[in-house]
Amino acid sequence: MLGQARLRSLIETVARTVIEHEDELTQLDSAIGDGDHGANMKRGFEAVLAELDALAAKPLPETLKAVGTQLVMKVGGASGPLYGTLFMSLGKSLPETLDRQSVAQALDAAIAAVRARGKAETGQKTMLDVLVPVQRALASGADPAAVAARANEAAEATIPMKATRGRASFLGERSIGHMDPGARSSALIVEAVASCFGIST
């Protein structure tokens, strides 16, 4: 079970990591999307930071559901509902007492929810191309550093992909050669979580 101080640190680290990478996410999205992913994600996680004390006072499952609600309300675009679904589903599936397998199982359920919401599969140049390999790494017993490394490798692996879902799919072949911004923001979140468990890349 995460104590209140550690839960607060976890939420804050994830939020600040995403906010600090606003420009990078904007640049990635400008190449193959609307160019608003960085600003949208920043707005969502600033709303999370504004509620930090209240969020950290809740049990972990309730915290994650509340974070998801904030992201749905504040992020907008395609990413808001997808990240909101991810966090809310994690909140529904995670027990209060964590171990690697329970996290892997909860992430698997959350991925299924994101897949249904976004009508996407792996290989289509989306956040799923990071989340699915991360879940597999967790399920295989990988430590936090290895999970974070896998997230970053998976985000890089979207560069040669042709987008077939989302705004980037309108570009067809021209989407090749660019990292998917949603994959990158997913990797940032995974890396931030991993760093809170004592190991960073």
Range-by-range predicted roles:
Residues 1-201:
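N-terminal loops that bind phosphate or other acidic moieties
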